[in-house]
Swiss-Prot record:
Keyword Membrane belongs to the record: no
Keywords: Cell cycle, Cell division, Cyclin
Entry-linked InterPro entries: Cyclin (IPR039361), Cyclin-like_dom (IPR013763), Cyclin-like_sf (IPR036915), Cyclin_C-dom (IPR004367), Cyclin_N (IPR006671), Cyclins_cyclin-box (IPR048258)
Cited SUPFAM superfamilies: Cyclin-like
Organism: Oryza sativa subsp. japonica (Rice)
Alphabetized GO MF terms: cyclin-dependent protein serine/threonine kinase regulator activity
Record PANTHER family: CYCLINS
Protein name from the UniProt record: Cyclin-D4-1
Record-level GO BP terms: cell division; G1/S transition of mitotic cell cycle
Protein backbone atom coordinates (compact mmCIF):
# COMPACT_ATOMS: atom_id res chain seq x y z
CA UNK A 1 0.00 0.00 0.00
CA UNK A 2 1.43 3.36 -0.98
CA UNK A 3 2.24 5.79 1.79
CA UNK A 4 -0.22 8.60 2.27
CA UNK A 5 0.96 12.12 1.55
CA UNK A 6 0.59 14.73 4.29
CA UNK A 7 -2.34 16.17 2.32
CA UNK A 8 -4.12 12.79 2.22
CA UNK A 9 -3.40 12.15 5.89
CA UNK A 10 -4.95 15.50 6.83
CA UNK A 11 -7.99 14.73 4.73
CA UNK A 12 -8.44 11.27 6.25
CA UNK A 13 -8.13 12.63 9.78
CA UNK A 14 -10.60 15.50 9.37
CA UNK A 15 -13.19 14.13 6.98
CA UNK A 16 -15.95 11.98 8.38
CA UNK A 17 -18.74 9.81 7.04
CA UNK A 18 -21.60 12.26 7.50
CA UNK A 19 -23.12 13.87 4.47
CA UNK A 20 -22.85 17.64 4.10
CA UNK A 21 -26.28 18.26 5.60
CA UNK A 22 -25.31 16.55 8.84
CA UNK A 23 -21.95 18.26 9.29
CA UNK A 24 -23.72 21.25 10.81
CA UNK A 25 -26.46 19.20 12.40
CA UNK A 26 -29.32 20.27 10.15
CA UNK A 27 -30.99 16.94 10.76
CA UNK A 28 -30.81 17.28 14.54
CA UNK A 29 -33.02 18.95 17.08
CA UNK A 30 -33.33 22.69 17.43
CA UNK A 31 -31.80 22.39 20.89
CA UNK A 32 -28.50 21.29 19.33
CA UNK A 33 -28.54 24.27 17.01
CA UNK A 34 -29.17 26.63 19.90
CA UNK A 35 -26.34 25.04 21.86
CA UNK A 36 -23.86 25.72 19.06
CA UNK A 37 -25.07 29.17 18.05
CA UNK A 38 -24.99 31.67 20.86
CA UNK A 39 -27.41 34.46 20.05
CA UNK A 40 -27.01 37.95 21.39
CA UNK A 41 -25.18 41.13 20.56
CA UNK A 42 -21.62 41.61 21.71
CA UNK A 43 -19.37 44.62 21.26
CA UNK A 44 -15.69 43.67 21.29
CA UNK A 45 -14.28 46.91 19.93
CA UNK A 46 -13.79 49.96 22.09
CA UNK A 47 -12.99 53.37 20.69
CA UNK A 48 -11.78 54.47 17.28
CA UNK A 49 -8.79 52.85 15.60
CA UNK A 50 -5.44 54.61 15.20
CA UNK A 51 -4.78 56.38 11.89
CA UNK A 52 -4.51 53.99 8.96
CA UNK A 53 -1.16 53.19 7.42
CA UNK A 54 0.00 51.62 4.21
CA UNK A 55 2.56 48.83 4.39
CA UNK A 56 4.11 48.62 0.94
CA UNK A 57 6.00 45.48 1.92
CA UNK A 58 2.70 43.87 2.80
CA UNK A 59 1.64 43.79 -0.85
CA UNK A 60 4.86 42.46 -2.34
CA UNK A 61 4.08 39.72 -4.85
CA UNK A 62 5.82 36.46 -5.54
CA UNK A 63 7.42 36.32 -8.97
CA UNK A 64 6.14 33.30 -10.95
CA UNK A 65 8.23 31.83 -13.73
CA UNK A 66 7.03 31.42 -17.30
CA UNK A 67 6.41 27.70 -16.72
CA UNK A 68 4.60 28.39 -13.46
CA UNK A 69 2.28 30.89 -15.14
CA UNK A 70 1.49 28.36 -17.87
CA UNK A 71 0.58 25.73 -15.27
CA UNK A 72 -1.56 28.19 -13.34
CA UNK A 73 -3.49 29.10 -16.47
CA UNK A 74 -4.15 25.41 -17.13
CA UNK A 75 -5.60 24.81 -13.65
CA UNK A 76 -7.24 28.14 -12.77
CA UNK A 77 -10.69 27.03 -13.93
CA UNK A 78 -10.67 24.45 -11.11
CA UNK A 79 -10.54 27.32 -8.61
CA UNK A 80 -13.49 29.29 -9.98
CA UNK A 81 -17.22 29.21 -9.12
CA UNK A 82 -19.65 27.37 -11.38
CA UNK A 83 -20.13 29.04 -14.76
CA UNK A 84 -23.75 29.97 -13.99
CA UNK A 85 -22.91 31.48 -10.59
CA UNK A 86 -22.92 35.16 -11.60
CA UNK A 87 -26.16 34.77 -13.56
CA UNK A 88 -27.87 33.05 -10.63
CA UNK A 89 -26.69 35.79 -8.28
CA UNK A 90 -28.06 38.55 -10.46
CA UNK A 91 -31.35 36.73 -11.05
CA UNK A 92 -31.95 36.15 -7.35
CA UNK A 93 -35.15 35.15 -5.66
CA UNK A 94 -36.23 32.32 -7.96
CA UNK A 95 -35.97 28.59 -7.47
CA UNK A 96 -32.34 27.57 -7.46
CA UNK A 97 -31.20 31.19 -7.67
CA UNK A 98 -28.86 32.75 -5.13
CA UNK A 99 -29.52 35.73 -2.89
CA UNK A 100 -27.06 38.50 -3.71
CA UNK A 101 -27.57 39.96 -0.25
CA UNK A 102 -26.19 36.77 1.32
CA UNK A 103 -22.95 37.27 -0.57
CA UNK A 104 -22.74 40.98 0.23
CA UNK A 105 -23.40 40.43 3.93
CA UNK A 106 -20.68 37.80 4.08
CA UNK A 107 -18.17 39.97 2.20
CA UNK A 108 -18.98 43.01 4.36
CA UNK A 109 -18.15 40.94 7.44
CA UNK A 110 -14.95 39.56 5.85
CA UNK A 111 -13.79 43.09 4.96
CA UNK A 112 -14.47 44.40 8.45
CA UNK A 113 -12.50 41.67 10.21
CA UNK A 114 -9.78 41.66 7.56
CA UNK A 115 -9.24 45.37 8.12
CA UNK A 116 -9.39 44.98 11.90
CA UNK A 117 -6.52 42.47 11.91
CA UNK A 118 -4.61 44.02 8.99
CA UNK A 119 -4.43 40.72 7.16
CA UNK A 120 -2.62 40.50 3.82
CA UNK A 121 -4.60 41.41 0.68
CA UNK A 122 -4.35 37.82 -0.56
CA UNK A 123 -6.19 36.65 2.57
CA UNK A 124 -9.26 38.70 1.63
CA UNK A 125 -9.06 37.48 -1.96
CA UNK A 126 -8.85 33.84 -0.85
CA UNK A 127 -11.78 34.26 1.55
CA UNK A 128 -13.98 35.66 -1.22
CA UNK A 129 -12.81 32.91 -3.57
CA UNK A 130 -13.84 30.24 -1.04
CA UNK A 131 -17.16 32.02 -0.45
CA UNK A 132 -18.06 32.27 -4.14
CA UNK A 133 -17.06 28.71 -4.94
CA UNK A 134 -19.01 27.38 -1.96
CA UNK A 135 -22.16 29.39 -2.73
CA UNK A 136 -22.05 28.23 -6.35
CA UNK A 137 -22.06 24.58 -5.24
CA UNK A 138 -24.01 24.49 -1.97
CA UNK A 139 -27.48 25.86 -1.29
CA UNK A 140 -27.79 27.33 2.18
CA UNK A 141 -30.95 26.28 4.04
CA UNK A 142 -33.80 28.78 4.03
CA UNK A 143 -34.63 30.52 7.27
CA UNK A 144 -31.17 30.10 8.78
CA UNK A 145 -29.71 33.61 8.61
CA UNK A 146 -27.00 32.68 11.07
CA UNK A 147 -25.41 30.45 8.43
CA UNK A 148 -24.37 33.47 6.36
CA UNK A 149 -22.29 34.81 9.22
CA UNK A 150 -20.97 31.34 10.06
CA UNK A 151 -19.93 30.79 6.44
CA UNK A 152 -18.10 34.13 6.40
CA UNK A 153 -16.25 33.22 9.60
CA UNK A 154 -15.25 29.84 8.19
CA UNK A 155 -14.05 31.24 4.85
CA UNK A 156 -11.93 33.96 6.46
CA UNK A 157 -10.59 31.53 9.06
CA UNK A 158 -9.48 29.10 6.34
CA UNK A 159 -7.96 31.91 4.27
CA UNK A 160 -6.03 33.21 7.28
CA UNK A 161 -4.70 29.72 7.99
CA UNK A 162 -3.50 29.50 4.39
CA UNK A 163 -1.85 32.92 4.20
CA UNK A 164 -1.19 34.46 7.63
CA UNK A 165 1.62 33.62 10.05
CA UNK A 166 -0.31 34.97 13.05
CA UNK A 167 -3.86 33.58 12.99
CA UNK A 168 -6.35 34.67 15.69
CA UNK A 169 -8.45 32.09 17.51
CA UNK A 170 -11.78 31.47 15.80
CA UNK A 171 -13.64 33.15 18.67
CA UNK A 172 -11.46 36.26 18.35
CA UNK A 173 -12.31 36.56 14.65
CA UNK A 174 -15.87 37.48 15.63
CA UNK A 175 -15.29 41.17 16.27
CA UNK A 176 -17.78 44.00 16.45
CA UNK A 177 -21.48 43.80 17.15
CA UNK A 178 -22.89 40.55 15.79
CA UNK A 179 -26.23 38.82 16.20
CA UNK A 180 -24.54 35.46 16.68
CA UNK A 181 -21.36 34.29 18.34
CA UNK A 182 -20.27 30.80 17.35
CA UNK A 183 -18.39 28.26 19.39
CA UNK A 184 -15.08 26.95 18.07
CA UNK A 185 -16.50 23.49 17.38
CA UNK A 186 -19.29 24.98 15.25
CA UNK A 187 -16.80 26.97 13.18
CA UNK A 188 -14.65 23.85 12.75
CA UNK A 189 -17.63 21.89 11.43
CA UNK A 190 -18.39 24.67 8.96
CA UNK A 191 -14.75 24.71 7.88
CA UNK A 192 -14.98 20.98 7.19
CA UNK A 193 -18.10 21.53 5.10
CA UNK A 194 -16.33 24.22 3.07
CA UNK A 195 -13.22 22.05 2.67
CA UNK A 196 -15.16 19.03 1.48
CA UNK A 197 -17.40 21.07 -0.84
CA UNK A 198 -14.34 22.68 -2.45
CA UNK A 199 -12.59 19.28 -2.66
CA UNK A 200 -9.73 20.58 -0.51
CA UNK A 201 -8.55 22.90 -3.28
CA UNK A 202 -7.60 25.73 -0.96
CA UNK A 203 -4.35 26.89 -2.59
CA UNK A 204 -6.54 28.79 -5.01
CA UNK A 205 -5.35 30.52 -8.16
CA UNK A 206 -6.34 34.19 -7.88
CA UNK A 207 -5.41 37.40 -9.73
CA UNK A 208 -2.65 37.83 -7.15
CA UNK A 209 -1.02 34.70 -8.60
CA UNK A 210 -0.30 36.59 -11.83
CA UNK A 211 -0.29 40.31 -11.25
CA UNK A 212 3.43 40.70 -10.53
CA UNK A 213 4.28 38.71 -13.66
CA UNK A 214 2.14 40.98 -15.83
CA UNK A 215 3.39 44.17 -14.14
CA UNK A 216 6.97 43.10 -14.83
CA UNK A 217 6.09 42.30 -18.44
CA UNK A 218 4.83 45.86 -18.85
CA UNK A 219 7.86 47.28 -17.03
CA UNK A 220 10.52 45.74 -19.25
CA UNK A 221 11.17 42.86 -16.85
CA UNK A 222 11.93 45.13 -13.89
CA UNK A 223 10.07 44.88 -10.55
CA UNK A 224 6.95 47.06 -10.34
CA UNK A 225 6.98 50.18 -8.21
CA UNK A 226 5.43 50.23 -4.76
CA UNK A 227 2.68 52.43 -6.16
CA UNK A 228 1.85 49.88 -8.86
CA UNK A 229 1.77 47.06 -6.32
CA UNK A 230 -0.51 48.97 -3.97
CA UNK A 231 -2.88 50.11 -6.68
CA UNK A 232 -3.03 46.63 -8.21
CA UNK A 233 -3.90 45.11 -4.83
CA UNK A 234 -6.59 47.68 -4.21
CA UNK A 235 -8.11 47.18 -7.65
CA UNK A 236 -8.14 43.39 -7.34
CA UNK A 237 -9.91 43.60 -3.99
CA UNK A 238 -12.42 46.15 -5.29
CA UNK A 239 -13.18 43.83 -8.21
CA UNK A 240 -13.50 40.83 -5.89
CA UNK A 241 -16.25 42.56 -3.92
CA UNK A 242 -18.45 43.03 -6.97
CA UNK A 243 -20.08 40.58 -9.34
CA UNK A 244 -19.17 42.19 -12.65
CA UNK A 245 -15.99 40.17 -13.17
CA UNK A 246 -17.09 36.81 -11.78
CA UNK A 247 -17.14 35.34 -15.28
CA UNK A 248 -13.52 36.20 -16.01
CA UNK A 249 -10.56 33.98 -15.26
CA UNK A 250 -8.06 35.16 -12.61
CA UNK A 251 -5.38 35.56 -15.31
CA UNK A 252 -7.68 37.80 -17.36
CA UNK A 253 -8.47 39.98 -14.35
CA UNK A 254 -4.80 40.26 -13.38
CA UNK A 255 -3.79 41.19 -16.92
CA UNK A 256 -6.53 43.82 -17.16
CA UNK A 257 -5.57 45.26 -13.76
CA UNK A 258 -1.88 45.43 -14.67
CA UNK A 259 -2.71 47.16 -17.95
CA UNK A 260 -4.99 49.63 -16.17
CA UNK A 261 -2.40 50.47 -13.53
CA UNK A 262 0.38 51.02 -16.07
CA UNK A 263 -1.92 52.76 -18.53
CA UNK A 264 -1.38 50.33 -21.42
CA UNK A 265 -4.78 50.10 -23.07
CA UNK A 266 -3.55 47.81 -25.83
CA UNK A 267 -1.34 45.49 -23.77
CA UNK A 268 -1.13 41.84 -24.80
CA UNK A 269 0.19 38.78 -22.96
CA UNK A 270 1.06 35.35 -24.30
CA UNK A 271 -0.97 33.43 -21.72
CA UNK A 272 -4.16 35.51 -21.90
CA UNK A 273 -6.80 35.72 -24.61
CA UNK A 274 -6.59 39.24 -26.01
CA UNK A 275 -10.33 39.62 -26.61
CA UNK A 276 -11.26 38.36 -23.15
CA UNK A 277 -8.70 40.66 -21.56
CA UNK A 278 -10.00 43.65 -23.53
CA UNK A 279 -13.54 42.83 -22.45
CA UNK A 280 -12.41 42.66 -18.82
CA UNK A 281 -10.72 46.05 -19.21
CA UNK A 282 -13.98 47.49 -20.52
CA UNK A 283 -15.88 46.09 -17.54
CA UNK A 284 -13.37 47.58 -15.10
CA UNK A 285 -13.59 50.94 -16.86
CA UNK A 286 -17.39 50.80 -16.67
CA UNK A 287 -17.10 50.19 -12.93
CA UNK A 288 -15.17 53.50 -12.73
CA UNK A 289 -12.69 52.06 -10.28
CA UNK A 290 -9.69 53.78 -11.81
CA UNK A 291 -9.10 56.84 -13.97
CA UNK A 292 -6.57 59.66 -14.33
CA UNK A 293 -6.61 62.32 -11.65
CA UNK A 294 -7.93 65.54 -13.23
CA UNK A 295 -5.09 67.69 -11.84
CA UNK A 296 -2.35 65.58 -13.39
CA UNK A 297 -2.39 63.01 -16.22
CA UNK A 298 0.40 61.09 -14.45
CA UNK A 299 -1.68 60.51 -11.36
CA UNK A 300 -3.99 57.54 -11.21
CA UNK A 301 -6.32 56.73 -8.36
CA UNK A 302 -9.03 54.37 -7.23
CA UNK A 303 -12.32 56.22 -7.34
CA UNK A 304 -13.87 56.97 -3.97
CA UNK A 305 -17.17 58.17 -5.42
CA UNK A 306 -18.69 54.74 -5.96
CA UNK A 307 -21.84 54.29 -3.87
CA UNK A 308 -22.78 50.99 -2.27
CA UNK A 309 -25.34 49.19 -4.41
CA UNK A 310 -26.88 45.70 -4.63
CA UNK A 311 -24.02 44.73 -6.93
CA UNK A 312 -21.66 46.20 -4.35
CA UNK A 313 -18.48 47.16 -6.12
CA UNK A 314 -16.76 48.41 -2.97
CA UNK A 315 -17.22 50.50 0.15
CA UNK A 316 -16.31 54.12 -0.37
CA UNK A 317 -13.87 53.78 2.51
CA UNK A 318 -12.00 51.05 0.69
CA UNK A 319 -10.44 53.50 -1.75
CA UNK A 320 -6.93 54.86 -1.77
CA UNK A 321 -5.66 57.88 -3.66
CA UNK A 322 -2.19 57.20 -5.07
CA UNK A 323 0.37 59.87 -5.86
CA UNK A 324 3.44 59.74 -8.06
CA UNK A 325 5.75 59.72 -5.00
CA UNK A 326 4.43 56.24 -4.10
CA UNK A 327 2.64 57.48 -1.00
CA UNK A 328 -1.03 56.92 -0.31
CA UNK A 329 -3.76 58.62 1.64
CA UNK A 330 -6.55 56.49 3.00
CA UNK A 331 -10.01 57.86 3.63
CA UNK A 332 -11.75 57.60 6.99
CA UNK A 333 -15.44 57.21 7.47
CA UNK A 334 -17.83 56.33 10.23
CA UNK A 335 -19.05 52.77 9.82
CA UNK A 336 -22.44 53.09 11.40
CA UNK A 337 -23.37 49.53 10.52
CA UNK A 338 -20.59 48.24 12.77
CA UNK A 339 -20.86 50.82 15.51
CA UNK A 340 -17.28 52.14 15.31
CA UNK A 341 -15.13 54.11 12.93
CA UNK A 342 -12.58 52.22 10.88
CA UNK A 343 -10.87 52.14 7.52
CA UNK A 344 -12.26 49.20 5.60
CA UNK A 345 -9.51 48.93 3.01
CA UNK A 346 -7.70 45.62 3.47
CA UNK A 347 -4.62 47.18 1.89
CA UNK A 348 -4.48 50.27 4.08
CA UNK A 349 -5.27 49.32 7.65
CA UNK A 350 -3.48 49.10 10.95
CA UNK A 351 -3.94 46.26 13.43
CA UNK A 352 -5.66 46.92 16.73
CA UNK A 353 -5.76 44.57 19.66
CA UNK A 354 -9.09 43.19 20.83
CA UNK A 355 -10.16 44.68 24.15
CA UNK A 356 -10.87 41.87 26.56
Amino acid sequence: MAALTSYEMAASILLCAEDSSSVLGFGGEEEEEEEDVVAGKRARCAGPPPPPCVDVAGVDFAVPSEECVARLVETEADHMPREDYAERLRAGGGDGDLDLRVRMDAIDWIWKVHSYYSFAPLTACLAVNYLDRFLSLYQLPDGKDWMTQLLAVACLSLAAKMEETDVPQSLDLQVGEERYVFEAKTIQRMELLVLSTLKWRMQAVTPFSYVDYFLRELNGGDPPSGRSALLSSELILCIARGTECLGFRPSEIAAAVAAAVVGEEHAAFSHVNKERMSHCQEVIQAMELIHPKPSSPSRVFVSSSIPRSPTGVLDAAGCLSYRSDDSAVASHYAASSWGYEHDSSPVSSKRRKISR
